[in-house]
């Protein structure tokens, strides 16, 4: 059975059982900025599972395109790993649970092929259930599985969870016995090569708390609603039904591999009989080509284009690995024009848009190959020379400088250098490479600071520094002082005068102004020089040792050599200092609760507020966040002395002062300690005692990237004002609801529940209105070239799922033996949309819903051959869309 047919049967089975067919989300994880790609079938439904949004349907089915990026380096080395895959899934949002999910899965798996099922032998299916899930065990018994083929497994294998806190619950997996030629008998506990897992049914019913690993966490209670999330790997099922060993042998992948073998003159599996080798370089490279070309096709098809960052870099890396692999197999010409059309033909049965959009996809793919071949030619020559020189010198590692030159000058990726060196039995000085990269980033950071001050060229700053030496910062001890103007930058020349209205950069010999750095915002204030005065707008350190004041001349003029009086905004300084000390306390307290891995990844110390980024593998539970906040404020109440002192780096480490990962420190460092509570290396300004902070209020905790979390908080009077506003709000709500303050939350929840119930009732009424005329419309179907055609506009206000439901309802009321096409147009928000539904009898005559929609929308729109939709035209075009579909049928 072909992969596309398995896909179709899966969707049809669940659609027939009341599930809405939901199209795959695009591969880029657009809805989650913390992820590059969708990696699971349930990701587009996460807001529904978490209760953040109300699902527009109670049950859904989809085939989701997924990408697994951690496997890139393993792809090809075994026949088990691939990057792109498809995940069949059926989902319930508070509708059905185990008693329906298990029979639905069993029915599709075991129903004969000629009856629309997958035709698996029921005697070869082994379900697993969670240890104490007697309910699931009994349901499996009720569908006919003998007790000795139902395996109970522990939390690590059969209990699923997502997020902390988050939903969790037991799961039940279905394994298929591939036969004695694949291993020992005895079920999945004995041999998971012979017994292949092909479907996982997750029963979400509990909420989990914080913990470590797959087993060590508490169950906090029941979820408000029980949900179902299942996943069947489409490629895995295809390998079972097609009687092949792995995904590289199925019909959507093997033709690409075969084409690569044809081009290179290699035979897949030639080195180990009829079965492909797991380790022979030829078979490894053929698998790399097959997987990566298919993945590149799907990524570009979903809008990703090659680049040097994010998703585009993943695509570039995948394409370059495929291109280099086929060149190592002996093919020296352009490979993408030969391979990409084969991948398109393999995948377009399920994704017809790949065929219609192939011109654009090919343009990007072919251009990327051309660019890489140029890079490869230049870089390979340099690398070959480096390899030869390394061997001649008797060394085992290519220098970091050479790897950096390849990367920086020739655009040769470091991962490719590492891979080629490994193939030649050599290593690469990765530490030296990283050090040179860090130096380059530091230079880029300095240039960015210079651009912020308006000077891309740092030479003027270096000249001032060389002529007068470093600027002395006195801001730790004083907030104002007499200073001499050393340079005026941004005027006609470094030694010219700045006049009223000009914005320039001033360099003083000494200054109390703190330059932005270490997450702390700069001081602001005024400088009075003779009869003139300037307002300091920003303070930066574009090159180490030189403090530059960006300032606007308010009156008079400022000349080099004049003596003036520099005075910072003390209210701002005190507010920033409070925030900075608070950040130290938050950092230490996070480590107290989360462990030493909770290291700082970034910060912002601004007047009255702070932002603290830290590394941690998991989120922070609300209860932990409350404890952190309480402990921080207890440190304020203790009124601990804040002390700063300079010592050696070795001594600072000995006394346990925290240093920021990646920062460079000199031999002498400044340590800031808050009593015995917190101790860090820090160059910022702080309060004298912790009690001066007044109050710290944590506002939020969120993810800003993989393994990086962010806490935001208010400090001092800003925290007090926030709580005062919150108090007034609660008091106002209590007054409106006429209840005590501690009952406001309960009353709000009741109101929200009532609103949701009312929305559900409105949804039911709207559905009744929309579907009420389905029977009459079906009875009025016209005849177009032997096809029953219904073209109608949906009732006013109907949109989205309502229109799809109406089209399917009309289709279901037409005699299934009669070819039928239903087109329903709708008008909403000034736009016209169209849903087309086609029954199997019409499909057998070559009619496709997706094709008809593309005709109506000039190539746009999408969906399956049975159900498709499009939109975006002006509302007045709705009748014309119906006529276009009718004309397309007439001309078919």
From Swiss-Prot:
It holds the Pfam family tRNA_SAD. It is an enzyme of class 6 (ligase). Binds 1 zinc ion per subunit. It catalyses: tRNA(Ala) + L-alanine + ATP = L-alanyl-tRNA(Ala) + AMP + diphosphate. Keywords: Aminoacyl-tRNA synthetase, ATP-binding, Cytoplasm, Ligase, Metal-binding, Nucleotide-binding, Protein biosynthesis, RNA-binding, tRNA-binding, Zinc. One of its GO terms (cellular component) is cytosol. One of its GO terms (biological process) is alanyl-tRNA aminoacylation. SUPFAM superfamilies: Class II aaRS and biotin synthetases, Putative anticodon-binding domain of alanyl-tRNA synthetase (AlaRS), ThrRS/AlaRS common domain, Translation proteins. GO terms for molecular function: alanine-tRNA ligase activity; aminoacyl-tRNA deacylase activity; ATP binding; tRNA binding; zinc ion binding. It is found in: Cytoplasm. Consists of three domains; the N-terminal catalytic domain, the editing domain and the C-terminal C-Ala domain. The editing domain removes incorrectly charged amino acids, while the C-Ala domain, along with tRNA(Ala), serves as a bridge to cooperatively bring together the editing and aminoacylation centers thus stimulating deacylation of misacylated tRNAs. Catalyzes the attachment of alanine to tRNA(Ala) in a two-step reaction: alanine is first activated by ATP to form Ala-AMP and then transferred to the acceptor end of tRNA(Ala). Also edits incorrectly charged Ser-tRNA(Ala) and Gly-tRNA(Ala) via its editing domain. HAMAP family: Ala_tRNA_synth_B (MF_00036_B). This is Alanine--tRNA ligase. The lineage of its organism: Bacteria, Bacillati, Actinomycetota, Actinomycetes, Micromonosporales.
């Amino acid at each position: 059975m072909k992969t596309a047919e398995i896909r179709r049967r899966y969707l049809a089975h669940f659609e027939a059982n009341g599930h809405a067919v939901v199209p795959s989300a695009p591969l880029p994880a657009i809805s989650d900025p913390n992820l590059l790609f969708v990696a699971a079938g349930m990701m587009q439904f996460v807001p529904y599972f978490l209760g953040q949004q109300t699902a527009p349907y109670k049950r859904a089915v989809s085939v989701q395109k997924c990408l697994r990026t951690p496997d890139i380096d393993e792809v090809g080395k075994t026949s088990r790993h691939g990057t792109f895959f498809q995940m069949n899934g059926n989902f319930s949002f508070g509708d059905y649970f185990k008693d329906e999910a298990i029979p639905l899965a069993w029915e599709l798996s075991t129903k004969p092929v000629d009856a629309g099922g997958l035709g698996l032998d029921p005697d070869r299916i082994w379900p697993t259930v969670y240890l104490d899930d007697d309910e699931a065990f009994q349901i499996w018994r009720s569908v006919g599985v003998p007790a000795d083929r139902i395996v109970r497994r522990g939390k690590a294998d059969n209990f699923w969870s997502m997020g902390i806190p988050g939903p969790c619950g037991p799961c039940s997996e279905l394994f298929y016995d591939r036969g004695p030629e694949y291993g020992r008998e005895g079920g999945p506990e004995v041999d998971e090569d012979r017994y292949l897992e092909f479907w996982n049914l997750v029963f979400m019913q509990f909420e989990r708390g914080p913990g470590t690993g797959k087993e060590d966490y508490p169950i906090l209670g029941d979820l408000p609603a029980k949900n179902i999330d299942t996943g069947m790997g489409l490629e895995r099922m295809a390998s079972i039904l097609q009687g092949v060993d792995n995904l590289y042998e199925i019909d959507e992948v093997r033709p690409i591999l075969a084409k690569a073998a044809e081009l290179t003159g290699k035979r897949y599996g030639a080195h180990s009989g009829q079965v492909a080798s797991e380790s022979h370089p030829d078979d490894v490279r053929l698998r790399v080509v097959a997987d990566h070309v298919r993945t590149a096709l799907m990524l570009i098809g979903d809008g990703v284009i090659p680049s040097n960052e994010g998703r585009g870099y993943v695509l570039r890396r995948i394409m370059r690995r495929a291109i280099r692999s086929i060149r190592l197999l002996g093919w020296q010409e352009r490979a993408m024009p030969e391979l990409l059309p084969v991948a398109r033909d393999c995948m377009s049965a399920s994704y017809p848009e790949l065929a219609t959009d192939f011109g654009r996809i090919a343009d990007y793919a072919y251009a990327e190959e051309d660019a890489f071949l140029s890079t490869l030619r230049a870089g390979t020559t340099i690398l070959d020379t480096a390899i030869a020189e390394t061997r001649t010198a008797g060394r085992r590692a290519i220098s970091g400088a050479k790897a950096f030159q390849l990367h920086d000058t020739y655009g040769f990726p470091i991962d490719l250098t590492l891979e080629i060196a490994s193939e030649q039995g050599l290593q690469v000085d990765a530490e030296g490479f990283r050090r040179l990269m860090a130096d380059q980033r530091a230079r880029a950071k300095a240039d960015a600071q210079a651009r912020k001050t308006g000077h891309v060229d740092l030479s003027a700053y270096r000249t001032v520094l060389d002529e007068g030496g470093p600027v002395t910062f006195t801001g730790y001890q004083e907030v104002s002082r007499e200073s001499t103007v050393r340079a005026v930058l941004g005027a006609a020349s470094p030694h010219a005068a700045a006049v009223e209205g000009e914005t320039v950069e001033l360099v003083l010999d000494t200054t109390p102004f703190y330059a932005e750095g270490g997450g702390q915002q700069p001081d602001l204030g005024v400088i009075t020089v003779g009869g003139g005065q300037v307002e300091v707008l920003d303070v930066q350190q574009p090159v180490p040792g030189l403090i530059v004041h960006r300032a606007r001349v308010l009156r008079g003029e400022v000349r080099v050599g004049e003596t003036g009086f520099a005075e910072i905004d003390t209210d701002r300084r005190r507010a920033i200092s409070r925030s900075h000390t608070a950040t130290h306390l938050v950092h230490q307290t996070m480590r107290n609760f989360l462990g030493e891995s909770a290291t700082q990844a970034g910060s912002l110390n601004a007047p009255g507020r702070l932002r603290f980024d830290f590394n941690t593998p998991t989120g922070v539970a609300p209860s932990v966040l409350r404890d952190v906040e309480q402990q921080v404020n207890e440190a304020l109440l203790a009124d601990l002395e804040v002390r700063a002192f300079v010592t050696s780096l070795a001594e600072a480490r000995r006394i346990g002062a925290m240093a920021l990962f990646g920062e460079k420190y000199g031999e002498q460092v400044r340590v800031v300690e808050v009593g015995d509570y917190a101790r860090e290396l820090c160059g910022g300004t702080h309060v004298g005692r912790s009690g001066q902070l007044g109050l710290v209020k944590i506002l939020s905790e969120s993810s800003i990237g993989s393994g990086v979390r962010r806490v935001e908080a208010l400090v001092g009077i800003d925290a007090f004002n926030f709580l005062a506003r919150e108090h007034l709000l609660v008091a106002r709500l209590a007054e409106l609801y006429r209840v005590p303050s501690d009952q406001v939350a309960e009353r709000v929840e009741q109101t929200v529940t009532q609103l949701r119930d009312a929305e559900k009732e409105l949804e039911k009424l709207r559905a009744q209105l929309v579907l009420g005329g389905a029977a009459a419309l079906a009875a009025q179907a016209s005849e177009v070239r032997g096809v029953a055609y219904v073209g109608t506009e949906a009732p006013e206000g109907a949109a989205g799922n309502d229109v799809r439901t109406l089209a399917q309802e009309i289709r279901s009321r037409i005699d299934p033996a009669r070819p039928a096409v239903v087109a329903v147009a709708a008008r909403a928000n000034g736009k016209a949309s169209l849903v087309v539904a086609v029954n199997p009898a019409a499909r057998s005559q070559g009619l496709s819903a997706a094709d008809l929609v593309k005709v109506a929308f000039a190539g746009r729109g999408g969906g399956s051959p049975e159900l498709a939709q499009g939109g975006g035209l002006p509302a007045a075009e709705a009748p014309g869309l119906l006529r276009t579909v009718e004309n397309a049928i007439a001309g078919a």
